[in-house]
Design a protein with these regions (language model features):
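Enzymes that bind and transform nitrogen-containing heteroaromatic metabolites
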Residues: 1-194
Length: 194
C-alpha cells in the first residue's frame, strides 16, 4: 500500500490441526507442495508482491540458510531472487549482526517499532512464519490481515498457531482458495471494534 499507512500481514502455513511446526520444531510438512505447479505459481506471485518481510529469529535463520544458496536459485529462481532482494526485518534479542542481504535487526521494543512503522507511509509488511512474533503483534492489535495456508496433514504434536493469546481476537474471512494439492488458503482481516 505505497503512499498510505502501512498494513501488517502474517502468512502462516499450518497443518490440519493448526500447527506451524511439528514436535521437533521442523516445518518440512509445509513444503510438500513444492512439486505442485499451481502451488509454486501461488508462492511465486506472493513473493513478487513486494513489501517488507519480517521474521523472528528461528524463521529468519531457516530462511537465511536457504534462499541465498545456489540450490534455492536453481530450484525456485523467481522466488529466490525476490526473497534475497526484498527488505527484511528480523526481531531477535540474541542475533548480533544479520548476514542475509537487506536485513534490519530489531533487538528491543518490537511492539513500539512496528507501531511506528505502521504509522509511516511505505510498503506493507508481511510476517512469514514466526509464531511468537505473530502472537505478540496480534495481542497488541497491530496485525491487520492473516493469511493461513492449511496443508492437508495432521501432525498430532508441535507448536500451534496463535497459542497463548490473552484474549479473543475477532477476524473476518475475506476470501478462500482451494488448490488441487489439497491445500486451502484463507484470508482474514482484523474485525474492527464496533
Amino acid at each position: 500500500m505505497e503512499g498510505g499507512l502501512r498494513q501488517l500481514s502474517a502468512f502462516m502455513q499450518v497443518s490440519l490441526d493448526g500447527r506451524f511446526a511439528d514436535a521437533a520444531a521442523e516445518i518440512s510438512f509445509a513444503h510438500q507442495q513444492a512439486a505442485d505447479a499451481e502451488w509454486h505459481q501461488f508462492m511465486a506471485e506472493n513473493a513478487a508482491a513486494g513489501g517488507v518481510l519480517m521474521f523472528g529469529r528461528i524463521t529468519y535463520d531457516l530462511m537465511a540458510s536457504w534462499w541465498p544458496t545456489p540450490a534455492a536459485a536453481k530450484a525456485m529462481p523467481e522466488i529466490a531472487r525476490q526473497m534475497n532482494a526484498l527488505p527484511k526485518i528480523v526481531a531477535s534479542r540474541t542475533l548480533s549482526s544479520p548476514k542475509w542481504s537487506n536485513t534490519t535487526l530489531v533487538s528491543r521494543d518490537l511492539i513500539g517499532t512496528v507501531r511506528r512503522m505502521k504509522a509511516e507511509s511505505g510498503p506493507d509488511i508481511t510476517i512469514l512464519g514466526s509464531g511468537s512474533i505473530v502472537t505478540q503483534l496480534a495481542t497488541a492489535q497491530l496485525i491487520d490481515r492473516i493469511e493461513v495456508a492449511v496443508t492437508p496433514i495432521a501432525l498430532g504434536a508441535g507448536k500451534t498457531f496463535l497459542a497463548g493469546l490473552p484474549l479473543p481476537l475477532p477476524f473476518t474471512l475475506k476470501r478462500t482458495r482451494v488448490f488441487d494439492n489439497g491445500s486451502v488458503v484463507l484470508w482474514y482481516a482484523r474485525k474492527e471494534a464496533a
